[in-house]
Curated annotation (Swiss-Prot):
[4Fe-4S] cluster binds at residues 139, 143, 146. Transmembrane segments: none annotated. The keyword Cytoplasm applies. The gene is rlmN. Keywords: 4Fe-4S, Cytoplasm, Disulfide bond, Iron, Iron-sulfur, Metal-binding, Methyltransferase, rRNA processing, S-adenosyl-L-methionine, Transferase, tRNA processing. SUPFAM superfamilies: Radical SAM enzymes. The active site is at 119 (proton acceptor), 369 (s-methylcysteine intermediate). Belongs to the radical SAM superfamily. RlmN family. This is Dual-specificity RNA methyltransferase RlmN. Its EC number is 2.1.1.192. Reaction proceeds by a ping-pong mechanism involving intermediate methylation of a conserved cysteine residue. It holds the Pfam family Radical_SAM. Residues 125-364 form the Radical SAM core domain.
Amino acid sequence: MSEQLLTASMPIDAAPLSDHAVATAAPATSKINLLDLNRQQMREFFAEMGEKPFRADQVMKWMYHYCYDDFEQMTDINKGLRAKLQRVAEIRAPEVAEEQRSTDGTIKWAIKVGDQQVETVYIPEGDRATLCVSSQVGCALECKFCSTAQQGFNRNLRVSEIIGQVWRAAKIIGAVKATGIRPITNVVMMGMGEPLLNLNNVVPAMDIMMDDFGFGLSKRRVTLSTSGVVPALDKLGDMIDVALAISLHAPTDDIRDEIVPINRKYNIETFLAAVRRYLAKSNANGGRVTVEYVMLDHINDSTEQAHQLAECLKDTPCKINLIPWNPFPGAPYGRSSNSRVDRFSKVLMEYGFTTIVRKTRGDDIDAACGQLAGEVIDRTKRTLKKKMAGEPIAIKTV
């Protein structure tokens, strides 16, 4: 697969919801939003219009390589087809409600999705630029150290609202690229929400990210992060191959039960077994998973707990990211001191684990890990909590 940088360039001359999800916001018009369709679905849509499949590929190239949303600008499409598309389809990405820029180059966009907002973050680092994308309006998992979880949960994002975050960011960056802002090289599903609780919209969106007629990223440059929805993780491995990161954050079940409540349903042993099953199917991970571990002062950061973590992960090929905790109002935790983080890291490295202390980015604009909040109307949190407590979570394929 060829790979391109995600930025708008100037040319030379609808998925079903998972059973557990509440209703996704309805389209504003009766037209088909082409951002909701991956390439297979686009070709089927064009076939229904009596058009050849390659016409769908042409339109996708204009949509994603150049970030065009006006059919009239697609000059290699005949006028008759352009007129037909104007009648039955549209390219409608979510709009930016607010932009904030950090002193370190990080950019946070508040993205309008219906009557609410999610947040998307652009993070430049060396020769890379990573876009952190949201998958849900809010989150139902209630991780105690995460600002998003404190907002409650409203709904899943549609495909167009997920890939639309990438489209909008690429268009903005393309418009200002002369100022030296780097094109997007990586996308991480680490924004608001649990991606595995929205598989039927997240998977087609990631498919578009990696499609040659989409954004053309390699599968190693698209990462999904999960807190441990085990049935959906098993399903993911049968649907798509992307890099995997796991939000572990504790070496033992007693601590993880408290700070990552889904652990009460799928404990660490069960979660890591599912991770190993995914790695056995995947070519995107280089044989190992990224373990994310937020450092909470005197909660999960002792030397003893570092030894416990090493023992916990001994059978799971991985690299470990230690993440300084980023505070938010009302949170019951403190950030681990540099000395405690250093000691923790050294223990892990003595066991042979590749261990990185993640640099905090965008904390001056509340864009750092765990700080994303957006604007969420919590309508369904209690229902989802009840399901997670006792009922199996049903997952449908696309």
